[in-house]
């Protein structure tokens, strides 16, 4: 019996490298297929994410709310109604609110103050689903696309921005949940993988952070939907078995500012496409 068990163990150890190699090869082939798909839809008219861009453009100029006005006077940091380059410089401090805000937070504020709109329904269901679009995702896609080709650059010029960055850094390394995970568990070192998928290192400035942050929002092929960084944060927390962060919360803004700072110099290519 011992000889049989030993033989089985030896056989398993012999076969295991080939199994892992085969699985990794399959994963690599999947990545190649996605890359081929990306190349096929370089034409904006072929990327499904641009349907969100088109819907967002309509929403931006559509009169809504109790005041029946559009969002075209909303100041996203570059001046009222100016969209080019705005997304590349967010999150940032806004003097009229006394807060550091990301795009979603700022949009919700503009809806409430300019349009007189109740944003609770938008916050309650911020992400699209089967048979349901999302105004927030569409607006983010449209506005982000106006910064396509612009290099990421966020300021840490005010005390509020510096404090928010420090909070984001602390959140990135904070271990929690039943798994004792943090963002750094997956993204705090080079060469990590999960289910044989490469994980970008996001705790230091560099190419990984640039390629990651510069390609959101993105059309997710596996979900047949456009997803924003807000959704990516929500999904990461879900996978870590942590309570979901509130949509457009200061915690998400802080973490986004920290990650975006690591990605400075990266050229936005949005909406992109991912698996």
Curated annotation (Swiss-Prot):
Binding site for heme c: 183, 187, 236
Means of activity regulation: Activated by free Cu(II) ions and pH values above 8.
Residues forming the catalytic site: 236
Protein name stated in the entry: L-cysteine S-thiosulfotransferase subunit SoxA
Assembly information from the UniProt record: Heterodimer of SoxA and SoxX.
Signal peptide bounds: 1-25
Top enzyme category: transferase
Reactions mediated catalytically: L-cysteinyl-[SoxY protein] + thiosulfate + 2 Fe(III)-[cytochrome c] = S-sulfosulfanyl-L-cysteinyl-[SoxY protein] + 2 Fe(II)-[cytochrome c] + 2 H(+); S-sulfanyl-L-cysteinyl-[SoxY protein] + thiosulfate + 2 Fe(III)-[cytochrome c] = S-(2-sulfodisulfanyl)-L-cysteinyl-[SoxY protein] + 2 Fe(II)-[cytochrome c] + 2 H(+)
Family of the protein in this entry: Belongs to the SoxA family.
Protein task: C-type monoheme cytochrome, which is part of the SoxAX cytochrome complex involved in sulfur oxidation. The SoxAX complex catalyzes the formation of a heterodisulfide bond between the conserved cysteine residue on a sulfur carrier SoxYZ complex subunit SoxY and thiosulfate or other inorganic sulfur substrates. This leads to the liberation of two electrons, which may be transferred from the SoxAX complex to another cytochrome c that then channels them into the respiratory electron transport chain. Some electrons may be used for reductive CO(2) fixation.
Residue numbers binding substrate: 232
Record has Phosphoprotein as a keyword: no
Cell compartment(s), UniProt: Periplasm
Domain Cytochrome c: 163-263
Cofactors (names): heme c; Cu(2+)
Gene3D superfamilies in UniProt: Cytochrome c-like domain
Domain of life: Bacteria
GO aspect biological process, one term: sulfur oxidation
Keywords for this protein: Copper, Disulfide bond, Electron transport, Heme, Iron, Metal-binding, Periplasm, Signal, Transferase, Transport
SUPFAM superfamilies (alphabetical): Cytochrome c
Primary localisation category: periplasm
Molecular function per GO: copper ion binding; electron transfer activity; heme binding; iron ion binding; oxidoreductase activity; oxidoreductase activity, acting on a sulfur group of donors, cytochrome as acceptor; protein heterodimerization activity; sulfurtransferase activity
Pfam families the UniProt entry points to: SoxA-TsdA_cyt-c
């Amino acid at each position: 019996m011992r000889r049989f068990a030993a033989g089985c163990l030896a056989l398993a150890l012999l076969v295991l490298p080939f199994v892992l190699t085969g699985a990794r090869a399959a994963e690599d082939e999947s990545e190649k297929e996605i890359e081929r798909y990306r190349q096929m839809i370089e034409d904006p008219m072929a990327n499904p994410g641009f349907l969100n861009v088109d819907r967002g453009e309509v929403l931006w100029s559509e009169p809504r709310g109790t005041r029946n006005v559009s969002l075209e006077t909303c100041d996203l940091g570059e001046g009222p109604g100016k969209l080019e380059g705005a997304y590349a410089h967010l999150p940032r401090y806004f003097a009229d609110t006394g807060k550091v805000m990301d795009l979603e937070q700022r949009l919700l504020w503009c809806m409430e103050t300019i349009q007189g709109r109740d944003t609770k329904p938008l916050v309650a269901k911020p992400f699209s689903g089967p048979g349901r679009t999302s105004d927030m995702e569409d607006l983010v896609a449209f506005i982000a696309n106006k910064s396509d080709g612009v290099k990421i650059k966020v300021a840490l010029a005010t005390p509020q921005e510096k404090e928010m960055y420090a909070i984001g850094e602390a959140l990135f390394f904070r271990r929690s949940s039943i798994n004792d995970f943090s963002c750094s568990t997956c993204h705090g070192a080079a060469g990590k993988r999960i289910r044989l998928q490469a994980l970008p290192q996001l705790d230091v400035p560099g190419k990984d952070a640039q390629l990651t942050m510069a390609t959101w929002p993105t059309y997710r092929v596996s979900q047949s939907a456009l997803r924003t960084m807000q959704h990516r944060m929500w999904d990461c927390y879900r996978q870590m078995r942590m309570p979901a962060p509130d949509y457009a919360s200061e915690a998400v803004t802080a973490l986004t500012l920290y990650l975006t700072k690591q990605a400075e110099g990266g050229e936005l290519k949005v909406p992109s496409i991912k698996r």
